Amino acid sequence: MNTRRELPESPYLAAASGRSPHRVPVWFMRQAGRSLPEYRELRAQHRMLQACFDAELVCEITMQPVRRHKVDAAILFSDIVVPLKAAGIGLDIVPDVGPVIDNPIRTLGDVQAMPALESPQVAPVAEAVRLLTAELGDVPLIGFAGAPFTLASYLVEGGPSRHHERTKAMMLGESSTWHALMTALTDLTIAFLQAQVDAGVDALQVFDSWAGTLSLTDYREYVLPHSSRVFATMAAAGVPMTHFGVGTAELLGAMSEALAPGAARVVGVDWRTSLADAAARVLPGAALQGNLDPVVLLAGWPVVEKAVRRVVEDGRAAVAAGAAGHIFNLGHGVLPATDPGIITDAVELVHSL
């Protein structure tokens, strides 16, 4: 059943779909997070994964930056390891460390023993989506998931990693095990995204946080087929889909290929790549999202104002050069030390330009 809302005036959905928005849309990755005192107050009482599986908490945390900053989109408060936890994989999110896996995946037998994700296991997430779509009014809700490669890296390494040694060793040296793992994680990612779509999200974003550690050759051989299946399957949902990674300048063309042809497609760009270069690298018909350096928000208003104006100008130039649209965002997530007042002022400035 299609529970999606009609939001014809949304500048975010317009830009993501290749239409002309009435203003430059803006939202921020990690806009619901530690930069907000109201978030810190809630999180002082609840562990991260506990919060991610509490529908009312997810709703409240997701709404906080929408109320405060008047951004043009909400993104569901969650974590990329939530579907792994929901499926029954032992893990925890350790403060100041990140996701830590109880029993890392190292063999084909480990892969074959992995549980699948069933929709009842993410019922709290779906309920949070329903609560949010009832409360958000004309603001669209973005659902999201981690991409198979990034999930695989956490599972194989056992936690965050600088060099992803075990992940790449499996990928390059045990390709049958690797592709079996990626197939299982692609199925899991699709199931998690589908549960969000069925509950009513208005758009999707897939985060491949660690894809930038790969060469283009390895990305095409070992990752692209699986990411492409995620987007090809989800294209039937009829919602805009964004593909984002960090340090992925050389991969932007391939990442745009992963997005299903004919769907509303957006490629996220980090601050290391100009929007002009990104527009030249992605396939025709893709919009761009980005790409302010998150650290700029720590540098004081005169610096922020200049940088925000530049990104808006660069976005307009990219659209003139052929990009389907531009959505203002950061090139990564909001840093915890960011003054929320600066974010509010940046949103107001983007809307005024």
From Swiss-Prot:
It catalyses: uroporphyrinogen III + 4 H(+) = coproporphyrinogen III + 4 CO2. One of its GO terms (molecular function) is uroporphyrinogen decarboxylase activity. Pathway: Porphyrin-containing compound metabolism; protoporphyrin-IX biosynthesis; coproporphyrinogen-III from 5-aminolevulinate: step 4/4. Its EC number is 4.1.1.37. Keywords: Cytoplasm, Decarboxylase, Lyase, Porphyrin biosynthesis. Pfam families: URO-D (PF01208). GO terms for biological process: protoporphyrinogen IX biosynthetic process. HAMAP family: URO_D. Catalyzes the decarboxylation of four acetate groups of uroporphyrinogen-III to yield coproporphyrinogen-III. This is Uroporphyrinogen decarboxylase.
